[in-house]
């Protein structure tokens, strides 16, 4: 039409909107290839949800600001001597009790029985350190899972007065499984808190 003029290039608004739209399309295509979807919030930062990661507050995840589930840890010590136990193999074995509980996160350690009862299913780490009283005496300590011995430690050097029987182990436990220490032989020296028992949850299953 006469008197009509075309203005090219387009005005500033169109020239800015077109590259922005192309950029967003390119980003969306890249995220689609990687299996992620962008979430665009007006006036906010770009949030990307990664595949395979549990949503906050959902199964397997915790909301921001909340403590992770399944925090379990304990540590206990003795403050006095332990009574002698029978020789191994004669059917007698004594439970080792700990009268001072230093840590009991999750409430799994029972001071009355000297046992740890798993509150959640998971992989746990346990460690014990037992010191014998006299030389020329053997100390044998077994870590028990319910009624089964898992590991044992010995201290039997006749020339050493204070020798430690120490061991550690990783165990998968179900809720209600009980872990304790049994003195199979000898005396324990706990007068200066030398004997100890501790454990913690590495990760839940």
Swiss-Prot record:
One of its GO terms (cellular component) is extracellular region. Keywords: Disulfide bond, Endoplasmic reticulum, Glycoprotein, Golgi apparatus, Secreted, Signal, Synapse. Its main location: endoplasmic reticulum. Residues 67-205 form the C1q domain. Transmembrane segments: none annotated. InterPro entries: C1q_dom (IPR001073), Cerebellin_Synaptic_Org (IPR050822), Tumour_necrosis_fac-like_dom (IPR008983). This is Cerebellin-3. Coiled coil: none annotated. Heterohexamer; disulfide-linked heterotrimers. Interacts with CBLN1. May also form oligomers with CBLN2 and CBLN4. The keyword Secreted applies. SUPFAM superfamilies: TNF-like. Residues 1-32 form the signal peptide. It is found in: Endoplasmic reticulum; Golgi apparatus, cis-Golgi network; Secreted; Synapse. The gene is CBLN3.
């Amino acid at each position: 039409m006469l008197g009509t003029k075309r203005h090219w290039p387009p005005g500033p608004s169109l020239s800015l909107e077109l590259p922005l739209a192309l950029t967003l399309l390119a980003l969306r295509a890249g995220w689609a290839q990687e299996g992620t979807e962008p979430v665009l919030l007006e006036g906010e930062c770009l949030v990307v949800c990664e595949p395979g990661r549990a949503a906050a507050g959902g199964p397997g995840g915790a909301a921001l600001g909340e403590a992770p589930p399944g925090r379990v840890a304990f540590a206990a010590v003795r403050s006095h001597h332990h009574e002698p136990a029978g020789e191994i193999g004669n059917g007698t074995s004594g439970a080792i009790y700990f009268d001072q509980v230093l840590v009991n996160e999750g409430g799994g350690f029972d001071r009355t029985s000297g046992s740890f009862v798993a509150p959640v299913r998971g992989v746990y780490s346990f460690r014990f350190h037992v010191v014998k009283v006299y030389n020329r005496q053997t100390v044998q300590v077994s870590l028990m899972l319910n009624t089964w011995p898992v590991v044992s430690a010995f201290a039997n050097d006749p020339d050493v007065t204070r020798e430690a029987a120490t061991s550690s182990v990783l165990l998968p436990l179900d809720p209600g499984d009980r872990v304790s220490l049994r003195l199979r032989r000898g005396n324990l020296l706990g007068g200066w808190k030398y004997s100890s028992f501790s454990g913690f949850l590495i990760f839940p299953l």
